[in-house]
Structures are given as structure tokens and as C-alpha cells.
Amino acid sequence: MKRLILFLSFCVAFLSMFADSWVRINQLGYIPKTSKVAVYLSEEATEVSSFQLVDVFTGKEVYTSKAVKPMGALGGMKATYRLNFSDFTRQGTYRIVVNGCESPIFPINGHVYDGTADFVLNYMRQQRCGFNPFLRDSCHQKDAFIRYHATKEGQHIDVRGGWHDAADLLQYTTTSANAIYQMLFAYQQNPDAFTDSFQANGLPGANGIPDIVDEIYWGLDWLDRMNPEKGELYNQIADDRDHIGQKLPQTDPSDYGRGPNNGRPVYFIDGKPQQRGTYMNATMGAASTAGKFASDFALGAEVLKPFYPQFSQKISSKAADALQVGIDKPGNTQTVSVVSPYIYEEDNWVDDMELGSVELFRMTGDGKYLTKAVEYGRREPVTPWMGADSARHYQWYPFMNMGHYQIAAHTTDARLKAEFLRNMRAGIARTYERGQAHPFLWGIPGIWCSNNLTTAMLTQCILYRTLSGDDSFEEMEGSLRDWLFGCNPWGTSMIVELPKGGTYPRATHSNWVFQNLGHPVGGLVDGPVYSTIFSSLRGVNITDDMPHVTANAYLRFQPGDVVYHDNTHDYSTNEPTMDGTASLTFPLSYYQKEGRAQTGAASADKNVYDEGGIKQGDPSKKNICLVFTSHDKTDGANYIISTLKKRNVKGAFFFTGHFFESFPDIVKRIQAGGHYVGSHSYGHLQYAAWENRDSLLVTKDEFTTDMLKGYEVMLKFGITKEQAPYFIPPYEYYNSTISSWAKELGLQIVNFTPGTASNEDYTWHGMPMEAEKYRSSQWLYDNMMKWEKKHTLNGHFLMIHLGTDDARTDKFYLKLDKIITTLQKKGYNFVSLEDMIGLNLK
């Protein structure tokens, strides 16, 4: 007996050695005033009574809480706990500590969502058909020949454009129209969240139109082509004969009976069943698609009017006709397949007609459309998947009914508003009840594209809360949001490269990955599915994968009922989709707006970014910010400090840890002058290779350790991270990964504005690097003035080194006084760093 006890004790001790625990968080971080709940997972039956927040920059414990809720076992995790720190609102950078287990680092500030809604548009551009800016090539130029039309069978119609649906190259009005509406709504509600960095064709370069509007127009132009005449609506381009392996769109070898890459079919909506493999689909009418046409044309006309007035008028005139098709042919329209039984099995349609009707009411003011919208809305008060355990693929689509919100938001009848708010609340409540026992409050059924359902419910929660003022479901809203960014069993973001410095899907089911061309950046992957669904699908596996991809990296964390795999051949959980990605634009832009409002920042970020770093302030304002950097040179300090004082100009100084330690008197003089003093790293590390900016030369741990060490030194001068959240990287050289790591620390990279070449004041004759070319001070000054005359210096960060090598005897900083006075005469204002940037990271 003693031997048995000793043996069992040894086994327990042995297992404990390999047991582990984790804290799951939102990797982006949190805005200050929002629901903030982390989840603790342990392979041991651990008791948790409290947890702490530790300030990463000071190492001090700043918060202790007993707001701990045990949630039981989950898969291989014997204990899970919800750790609620919603009442902690102080901006900063933290980690959670619970039972000796530490979470990853995360920030709390008003800017964690800045730029994220724009970021997901990268995937939409990658999915473009007709001309693909990612490939810089055209594709599918022969689309398409007509099917199922009584008099036009086989005829050609120009339906080029739009987006490929996912890794396959099919195009569906069902998903594309929903994607268009989601982006329209996001821009209508939160226009300041979107910027202009790309042309209308998707290639880099501003065109004076917000990028999301470019994307909306790309989609609506295609949708307009899919409705060439009154009553003539098309539902789909291509079919599952496309599914012949991974391929590139410009050389698509799919054969639809006319030879490879020689045109694809486009399917007319006749309101009758069409092919589904060896069977027929369950189409009963045209209304589900017709309603989508109508809502897109109506809202699209409003949004596009300032940018494309003629096109706006054109689609405005089509909206009522499209809705009439749905009135004449009530019922659902499903998609077509030829080889397999897999289709979009949309069964509902009154939601689409409700939204189409209410948008026509908004466009025309005609009350008959509101009456119709209410009639349709009452036929489906709650989208049926909400609270259910299962549903067929896209059976209840779109996954949330925007019509309910639009009626409640725009009716003047208080009773009607209350009715449709109750409808919204009922769907949320059902999902909430289903998720109550789940450690992550995830009440979403584990069906195909569960992340799309998660995003839809998140959107409904936001809209209900903001319109009703009822915050009863705010914790679930936060859990759904955080699920998408890593507060889930697997600890991964569900959006490719967001955040880039974090954990996100890397082995996605994507043509770009299979062809080694890149990643579907910004794409929202399908998300977890029931284990039974995964096991039943054809061709899906996690073993026949690409080199260097682990077969089941998340095996340890699989909850059991559902699975998620970061594997290229798992198209059920790891394939990005176009409609799901577009649906992110509203919640992400909303949280950006909410975060900025909470911290008093300007609603619109007018700064210009490069690889995540700010390289220019607002280009419309005649403001200039002087920035100075140094690692070990100080010969210009006296002149620069005295000149700034004489001219009453505030500059921004960025020093390495070595500089702070070596030249404390200079630092103190600069501080006394009221200038910004920030970090230039501690050890002046080179982050990326000169020959390849994407090639990192430091690890995340090395970067973080170096930055924290630098701020530790700065703290001796009374400079906290909150006082100095902006830093210039060593060598003024970085990439988007470094920017992401910095943002995780609550820091924002700033860099000089290219063009003037003032940063080249460190060069000297005979430099050892042949690539470096000596620039005299006169040349630098003249070039600056030429650049100003041609381009202006609006929003420029003009950089001058605090000192240079002794080999350079011609010191450019000696022209500082002349630069200031000359540019002031030209009407420029020299402003502080904080005033230039306009963010509030403190």
C-alpha cells in the first residue's frame, strides 16, 4: 500500500512538472472604459482567489482584484477563471499575474484600435477580381456567359470586378452585397476612422478618397453590372468547378465547358431551384438577393454622392426596382454547385427585404417603405441561429439583421422603436444565455464561419447598447470582441497579422500562402467548428501540410466540442472570407472612435503613417516639429538648446539609454527648457537588415528588454512612459513588426518626414560605407527649401542630429536659426511633438 501511495505521489508530481497555465487576453489591448476580462486556464485543478496588474515599465503592482469567477473545466484545462478588471481605467502597459502565471504584455489606452478598420481593407484589395492590385495583374476578363435566363442563355455579359469570395475564386452576390453594406454602414457611422493611402485601383497612393470608399465603389460598380436591366438580377459567377486545387486568378485553369480560363458562367435569378451537384437547391424566390441589391443601392447612393455623383444617381434609380423583384418573387435564393453539394444554403429572406425597404424609406422619405419594412421585420423578430446549437451553411444570412437597427434608429414612433429594440435584445439575450457557462462567454454555435457569427453578434451588441443605453450585455460584447484578438482557448488572433507582433493565423488556407506569395493580410479566418463538422468535410486535414507547419499546434488547447487549426488544408477553420472581413469594419471603426473620445483625442487621425510609424503630421496644416536624436554625440547641444530658447520653439529630443547615462547634464538642460525628451532605444540596436526591411535582426524579447531598460534609465530623470510615449527607432529604421511590438508596449513610433534629407547631416567625406553620400550643410539647406517650394513642409518632422562625427566639420545644426526664421517668414508654425501628433497616449 505504501509503495502504491509513493508511486501515485510520484505520478502526481511528475504530471505537475508538465502541467501549465495561461492567461488569455486581447492582444491589441483595451480602451480605458470598456469591459476588460482576461481568462485564466490551467491544466491543474487550481484555486484562484485574486489577481494583480503589474506596470511593465516600473515593475510595480498597480491593481489587485478579487473579481474572479470560476468557470470549470474546458477540454484539457481542469480549471478556468474569468478575471474582471473593467474598473481599472488608467492608461499604461501591463501584465496580469495570477498564481505565478503571467499574461502577455498589453496596453490600455484610447488608441489600441487606431487604424485597424483600415488594416482589414488590405484583404479586400487582395480579393479583387478584374484587376488585382496584390498581383498587379488583371484576371477573369471574359466574365461571363449567362445561365438560367429564358432568352439570354449563353450570351456574354460584362460582369468584371468585385471580389473573389475566399481562397476559391467564385463570386456571390449574397456575400458581396453584405460586404458592401457592412462597409457602407461603417463609413457612414464612423467616417473619421478611415484614411486615404490607396488609389481607386487598389495600388498604393492617395487619391483624395477614403480607401473604404474606394472599396465600396469597386463593389458597387460590380453590383451595378450584376443588375444590367430592370428586373434582371444575377446571383453568382462561377461554381465549384473552380475547386481544382490552389491557383492564381490571372491564370485560372478552371474549365466551364469553354476551355481553361475562357470565361465563367453567371447565374440569373429566376426564383426557381437551380443545380446543387446531382440535386437541385432549395431556391423559392428572388427576395433574399433582391433585398440586398436594394439596400446597397439606396445606402450606396447616399455614401457615394460626394465622390461619384453620377454613379450615385444611377444606382439610386435602381434601388426601388430591385426591391420590386423581391416583392414579385418572395422567397430565398440559394447558390449553385455542379460537382459537390456545398452551397450557401440561405433560407431566410424577410430580413433582406426589411433592410431594403427601410433603406428606401431613408432615401425617399416615403412612409410606404417603412410600413413594408415593419411588416417584413415582424415576420422574423430574431435571426434564427441566435441561441441555437446549429444551422446549415449560411442558412440564416446575413448573420445579423441590420434592418431591425435601422427601423429603431429612424422611426419617430416610440412604440415601434421599442419593439425593434426588443427584437435586437432578444437575439442578444439568447446568445448570452447559451454562453453563460462558457469560460469565454462564447454563446456562438460552432458552425462553419463561426467568426463571422461572432462579428455579427458583436455588431448587434454595439448597436443595441448605443441605441438603447442598456449596457446589460457589455461583458459579452467585450468577450466577443476579445475572442477575435486572442482571448480564446488557443490564444490567437483570428485576423491575419493583427496584431503583427502577436499570435495570429500564419498557415492559412490561401492561394497566396500555397504559392508562397505572401499572406492574406487583414483577413478574418473562418474560426472554430464543431469537431463533428471538421471530421465530416471532404478534403480537409491537418497532416498533409506545407513544410515547417506543425500538424496540430493547438492540440493542447482544443476544447473538445470545437476545434481550430492553423493549418493550410483546414479550409473549415483557417480560410479567410471576404464577407466576414468586411463585417469587421464597423466594430473596429466604432472602437477607434470610442477610444479616442474617451481620451480626448481628435476624432480624426490626420497623421501620415509608414509601416505603423508616424512620418508626418496633418499635411493640411503649416506646422513643423523639430526633432533631434543622439546616441553618443553632443557637439551641437549648446547651440541647439540656446537657439530654441531664443526663438521660443519647443523641440523633441530622442536619446538612447547610453546617452542618458553619459550626458545627464544635457538631458536636464533640455528638460528645463520644456522640450519633449523621449527614447531612441537603450542600446541603439539595428532592428532590420538594410538590404531587406522585412528581415528582423532582433527578437521580440530583445526589443522589449532593450526598450524597458531604456525607460528604466529615463525614470531616473523623472521621465515616465506616460510622459514619453513616442520614440524614434535607432538609425530611424524599423518595420511594421517593430511598430506592432511598440504598440503592444503602449508606444508609438515617430520618424522624420522623408524628402528634405535633413537627416543626412551625419555624413562626411570618406565615410566607410560607399552607399553613403556626403551632403554639405549648404546642400541640405538648399534641398530643404527646394522641397518646401515644391511640396510644402506641412506636418513635417524636420530631423537634425544633436551631434555628428568629428570628421564632419561642416555642422548642419548651425543653420538651425536660419531654418527657423526663414520658415516662420513663410508662415510655418513650429509646434511641440504632442501638438503636432494630436494623440493622447498619456
Where are these regions (language model features)?
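Catalytic domains of cell-wall/extracellular-matrix polysaccharide-remodeling enzymes
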Residues: 639, 661-665, 686-799, 803-829, ...
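Bacterial Sec-dependent N-terminal signal peptides
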Residues: 1-20
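Active-site beta->alpha N-cap acidic-glycine motif
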Residues: 604-695, 709-725, 822
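Aromatic-lined, polymer-binding surfaces characteristic
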Residues: 290, 294-304, 312-362, 391-408
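Acidic, glycine-anchored loop motifs typical of Ca2+
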Residues: 201-209
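Aromatic (Trp/Tyr) and acidic
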Residues: 27-104, 110, 125-178, 185-186, ...
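Carboxylate/His-rich catalytic cores and anion/metal-binding grooves
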Residues: 212-237
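Structural recognition of the beta-strand scaffold that forms the well-ordered cores
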Residues: 175, 180-187, 223-225, 234-235, ...
